[in-house]
Amino acid sequence: MQKLNRSFKISNEIKKKISWIICYQLCDPRLFNILISVSSVNLSRDFSYAKIYVSILNNKNISFKEILTILQNSSKHIRYLLAKGIFLRIIPTLHFCHDSSYVNGTKITNLINNVLYNK
C-alpha cells in the first residue's frame, strides 16, 4: 500500500510539472496555439520509465502524430527541465502517447443520444 501511495504521489507531481513545462517552458513554434493537456502519467515500478498520456486540442493543420513526434523529440529537454523541478534519484525516461478518451467519450455520448432520441 505504501508503494502505491508513493507511486500515485510521484506520478501526480510529474503530471503537474510536465504540464507546466509544456505550457510555459517548451518554446517550439510548431506548438504555439495548440492546447496540450497531460491527462495521466503511468510510472514503471522502479520509476525509470513514464508513459505520459496527452490530450490535444488542435486548431492548426497538424496531425496528432506530428505533435507526438515533436513532444517525443523534445523529451530529453523536458526531462532535463523536470529534473530541475522535482527531486528524485532517478528521473524517468519519458514516452508520450495520445489520450483518446475524450474522443471516445464523445462518440459514446453521441451514440447514446441517437438511441434515446430516435426511439
From Swiss-Prot:
Main location: cytoplasm
SUPFAM superfamilies reported in the protein's UniProt record: Ribosome-binding factor A, RbfA
GO molecular function: ribosomal small subunit binding
Gene Ontology cellular component annotations, sorted alphabetically: cytosol
Keyword Acyltransferase among record annotations: no
Cross-referenced PROSITE patterns: RBFA (PS01319)
Sorted UniProt keywords: Cytoplasm, Ribosome biogenesis
Statement: the UniProt record of this protein carries the keyword Acetylation: no
Subcellular location per the Swiss-Prot or TrEMBL entry: Cytoplasm
Superkingdom field: Bacteria
InterPro entries documented for this protein: KH_dom-like_a/b, RbfA, RbfA_dom_sf, Ribosome-bd_factorA_CS
BP-aspect Gene Ontology terms: maturation of SSU-rRNA
NCBIfam families: rbfA
Function of the molecule: One of several proteins that assist in the late maturation steps of the functional core of the 30S ribosomal subunit. Associates with free 30S ribosomal subunits (but not with 30S subunits that are part of 70S ribosomes or polysomes). Required for efficient processing of 16S rRNA. May interact with the 5'-terminal helix region of 16S rRNA.
The protein's assembly and partners: Monomer. Binds 30S ribosomal subunits, but not 50S ribosomal subunits or 70S ribosomes.
Family per record: Belongs to the RbfA family.
Record's protein name: Ribosome-binding factor A
Name of the gene this protein is made from: rbfA
